[in-house]
Amino acid sequence: FYGGPVWAAHSDAANATMIDSDDVLLLKPAWPAAGFDLAGKQRPSLADDEKPIQNKPLTGIVVIEIHHLQPGTEADFATRFETETACLMTADARLLAAFVTEHAENSFPRLPVRADENVFISVMGFASTEAHARHQAALAASPAWQDFWQAAQLGLTKQTETLRLLPTSQSLVGR
């Protein structure tokens, strides 16, 4: 991709939209089928789609949590996360993907990867900010989740980062 004609034609414009293109992690799905499942999804055509700024704001949000873990604990964290979150998913809250650090050589050195990181990343979709708040309340009320989270805190090397994103009108994620 980065050596092809599309990137050559649009790299300056794409790079101008990025806050930090040096903050890169090499990731793999946390368990089989944990990557994004976009099968059967299609983008609406621009001609048919109303822009979110015009009369139709997007209500859904995508929440990404980056858990910084002690080396060698990613698999256990992923297994417990998958088990404890499964019972808390609803139609308004769904796990879109989960990733862990891929401990492999960076095969694209032009893009520097932070090789010393050990992370578990969850990507969750919510129907609305209210649905996200309800999900957070359900987590707080779940003894199983609280047990998992208290134990997980011991394996974190720094505070969990939380990113909240609004899917664009053309996004396949969060639809």
Named regions from a protein language model:
Residues 1-32, 83, 87-97, 112-119, ...:
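An amphipathic, aromatic/His-enriched active-site/gating alpha helix that lines ligand/cofactor pockets
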Residues 33-34, 41-107, 115-125, 129, ...:
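Surface-exposed interaction/gating patches
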